[in-house]
């Protein structure tokens, strides 16, 4: 081949190689742009500080997938690929924060649960964040609300007061979960505003927490689950004081395998002379809980403290219902939910650790938390001490 031909071939090869390089660089740039665009659309939640105690991080990573699988099983949902978002905090409008950390749990790209790490027992409330023992809980708390705005490039602050939980975005405050109080109006928009101090702290302290997927080891972490065979959630408490009525109805429906019980009818039986208008304000006392259970053929007795994991396991196998009696740690006499009742649904072993499954009448799904925790961090930013149980429903 003469030199001119060699030169021509070399030039052609050079042109082809340069073209391929340009195309590959373009594809690389477009790919990076797509990733950046996708990343920019992630929901961001404002926090004062992104510093999370290492024990909280470790517990969340170790526990979230097993908890999610166990809760999926309770709702007969298919398991999937579980991932953990970043921790966020919830603030009062004056800037105070609560003592818990919240993680969005993501399954197949959708926020399905919220993992909550809160003080384990009453003594932990007085300890520092680093020294505190934490209880792990999973529920659907505000998960659907977060998922609805997950891909809308939103930047929010999660707030709370006695009426419920709110999302603040661009100066607008929106109620997403209302407290079950009598005469509480479910206002979608609120005139409340974030305090200037909190605004400044959120603005200057750190970058927001991103609700994004983090890879985690996926293992079969649920070793055992045992629940009341026929337990179903049929109703939800909102604008009344009937937590014990809801809990008794749910437990009796489960253990008798029926759907004849409901909270209203139980409260009407307990308060036959009270008007319908005043009935929502009526609460239930321990002697009424025992007497109503007996009237339905159940031998109810009160037991102090939290029942052991083994006791819950055996009672659940025997189709015997347990009602939780809890009291607000704050002891605020003006709190309409100073006392609260919940239904134990069963127990589980996740990562070789003992858990209890329960239903809070304020919620539409079950919750799971550590069996050795006497504190219940419930949906409306309240810590309750589990002081006793009614057994036998």
UniProtKB/Swiss-Prot annotation:
EC code(s) of this entry: 3.4.22.-
InterPro entries per UniProt: Cystatin_sf (IPR046350), Papain-like_cys_pep_sf (IPR038765), Pept_his_AS (IPR025660), Peptidase_C47 (IPR008750), Staphopain_pro (IPR028076), Staphopain_pro_sf (IPR037155)
Keyword Plastid found: no
PROSITE patterns linked to this entry: THIOL_PROTEASE_HIS
Residues flagged as site, Cleavage: 219-220
Signal sequence residues: 1-36
Keywords: Hydrolase, Protease, Secreted, Signal, Thiol protease, Virulence, Zymogen
PTM field: Proteolytically cleaved by staphylococcal serine protease (SspA).
Pfam name, any one: Staphopain_pro
Propeptide: 37-219
A GO molecular-function descriptor: cysteine-type peptidase activity
Main subcellular location of this protein, as a coarse class: secreted
Catalytic machinery residues: 243, 340, 360
Subunit: In the cytoplasm, prematurely activated/folded SspB forms a stable non-covalent complex with SspC.
More about this protein: The cascade of activation of extracellular proteases proceeds from the metalloprotease aureolysin (aur), through SspA to SspB.
Name this protein carries in UniProt: Staphopain B
Biological source species: Staphylococcus aureus
């Amino acid at each position: 081949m003469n030199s001119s031909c060699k030169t021509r071939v070399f030039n052609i090869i050079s042109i082809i190689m340069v073209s391929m390089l340009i195309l590959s660089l373009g594809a690389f740039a477009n790919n990076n742009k797509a990733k950046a665009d996708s990343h920019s659309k992630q929901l961001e939640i404002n926090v004062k500080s992104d510093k999370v105690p290492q024990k909280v991080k470790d517990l969340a990573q170790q526990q979230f997938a097993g908890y999610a699988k166990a809760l999926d099983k309770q709702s007969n949902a298919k398991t999937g690929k579980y991932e953990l978002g970043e921790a966020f905090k919830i603030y009062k409008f004056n800037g105070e924060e609560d003592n818990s950390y919240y993680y969005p749990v993501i399954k197949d790209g959708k926020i399905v649960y919220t993992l909550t790490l809160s003080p384990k027992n009453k003594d932990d409330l007085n300890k520092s964040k680093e020294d505190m023992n934490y209880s792990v809980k999973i529920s659907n708390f505000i998960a659907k609300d977060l998922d609805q705005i997950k891909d809308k490039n939103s930047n929010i602050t999660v707030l709370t007061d006695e009426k419920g939980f709110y999302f603040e975005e661009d100066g607008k405050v929106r109620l997403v979960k209302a407290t079950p109080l009598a005469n509480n109006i479910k206002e979608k928009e609120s005139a409340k505003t974030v305090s200037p101090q909190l605004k400044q702290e959120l603005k200057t302290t750190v970058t927001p927490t991103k609700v994004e997927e983090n890879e985690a080891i996926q293992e079969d972490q649920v070793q055992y689950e045992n629940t009341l065979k026929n337990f179903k959630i049929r109703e939800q408490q909102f604008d009344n004081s009937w937590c014990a009525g809801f809990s008794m109805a749910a437990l009796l429906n489960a253990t008798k395998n029926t759907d004849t019980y409901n909270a209203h009818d139980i409260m009407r039986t307990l308060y036959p002379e009270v008007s319908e208008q005043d009935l929502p304000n009526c609460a239930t006392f321990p002697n009424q809980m025992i007497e109503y259970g007996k009237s339905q053929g159940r031998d109810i007795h009160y037991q102090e403290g939290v029942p052991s994991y083994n006791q819950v396991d055996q009672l659940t196998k025997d189709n015997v219902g347990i009602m939780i009696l809890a009291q607000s740690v704050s002891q605020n006499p003006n709190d309409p939910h100073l006392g609260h009742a919940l239904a134990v649904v069963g127990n589980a072993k996740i990562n070789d650790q003992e858990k209890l499954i329960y239903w809070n009448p304020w919620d539409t799904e079950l919750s799971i938390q550590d069996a050795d925790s006497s504190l219940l961090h419930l949906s409306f930013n309240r810590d309750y001490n589990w002081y006793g149980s009614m057994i036998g429903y």
